[in-house]
Amino acid sequence: MAAISSLPFAALRRAADCRPSTAAAAAGAGAGAVVLSVRPRRGSRSVVRCVATAGDVPPTVAETKMNFLKSYKRPILSIYSTVLQELLVQQHLMRYKTTYQYDAVFALGFVTVYDQLMEGYPSNEDRDAIFKAYITALNEDPEQYRADAQKMEEWARSQNGNSLVEFSSKDGEIEAILKDISERAQGKGSFSYSRFFAVGLFRLLELANATEPTILDKLCAALNINKRSVDRDLDVYRNILSKLVQAKELLKEYVEREKKKREERSETPKSNEAVTKFDGSLNSMRH
């Protein structure tokens, strides 16, 4: 289980001294206001944004974590709680950078990471509630994240490697989102690259079944994204998935061992009771 807490996110290592105790992590968290703005783009289209303006005073990491702990009050299994708290710190640092601007690829990346992390969590209802508490603690809209991730996934499933990178020559809602990202990444607006964005790109390629290695190069070029950064962060992501699998296997083994111990303990009193009754029967026969 220790493997999961050593995820190689640089931001997580910097924030290690802010990690809450297990008791605190088992509490839950509070809601913040969603900061949304809408900018018309190309006629009637609108692009929804979650963005911190220059005049905003960002909350501290401690305040964001406290919001989460207030909003979700049920205990979270420690193997999940540790990583969630570390991811929350990392995402807080991204969220309140002056260049941060929400986009659907980022949302897809985070949703992908979250769903991979929480796969196998005992309760689907709790898993959804934790997601809502997490995103709300960052003053963003959890429903927007899910809706945008779903739209991106549906679009990617209808694409192939070539059509994926030719978005700039096409019209459509998702194409408009990708064009906007490309323009901002080129310096025509606010854009802050992140590992979640890299995972979002990876997910698009995966769903489009774009296995040709050069497709990622072309997509990064079309989006004006540094391919070397994407490669590096996808290696980190794959490493995380590997650690998650190992940690969950350890958790499964631990749960099975504890279950077996409980069953053995429950059987022992019954055996003692049977022996006592047998001895009592022998005594009554002697008399």
UniProtKB/Swiss-Prot annotation:
Listed InterPro entries: Thf1
Entry GO CC: chloroplast outer membrane; chloroplast stroma
Bias (Basic and acidic residues) ranges: 256-270
Transmembrane spans: 191-213
Region Disordered: start-end pairs: 256-287
Parts of the chain on the Chloroplast intermembrane side: 1-190
Annotated coiled-coil segments of the chain: 237-267
Principal location: plastid
Swiss-Prot/TrEMBL keywords: Chloroplast, Coiled coil, Membrane, Plastid, Plastid outer membrane, Transit peptide, Transmembrane, Transmembrane helix
Pfam families xrefs: ThylakoidFormat
Membrane topology: Single-pass membrane protein
Membrane topology, Cytoplasmic segments: 214-287
GO biological processes: photosystem II assembly; protein import into chloroplast stroma; protein import into chloroplast thylakoid membrane; thylakoid membrane organization
Subcellular location, record wording: Plastid, Chloroplast outer membrane; Plastid, Chloroplast stroma
The family this protein is said to belong to: Belongs to the THF1 family.
Cited function: Involved in a dynamic process of vesicle-mediated thylakoid membrane biogenesis. Required for the normal organization of vesicles into mature thylakoid stacks and ultimately for leaf development.
PANTHER family: PROTEIN THYLAKOID FORMATION 1, CHLOROPLASTIC
The protein's name: Protein THYLAKOID FORMATION1, chloroplastic
Origin species: Oryza sativa subsp. japonica (Rice)
Gene name tied to this protein: THF1
